[in-house]
Amino acid sequence: MDDLELIVKRCDEAIEQTPDQADLHRDRALVLTLLGDQAKACDNVATAVSLLKRSSQPVDPMLQHELQVRQSSCKQSRTMTGSD
């Protein structure tokens, strides 16, 4: 198994244990991007953003900023492919 695929599997396992943890979805999005699966990566970014919006806990400003940047990148990709 490829190293990146193994990392995705580990991310999947971590998310299965704590699905409401936005940073895990962010991490999986990064690895999926490296694997070239932009659509799944963007789905994970959207999930992470949604989790942050629903969170009653203080939000890490760096995590929030990183997700905003990734979300913009996803929107740009959708615009370029004509799906947005």
Feature-to-residue mapping (PLM):
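Alpha-helical tetratricopeptide repeat
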Residues: 1-84
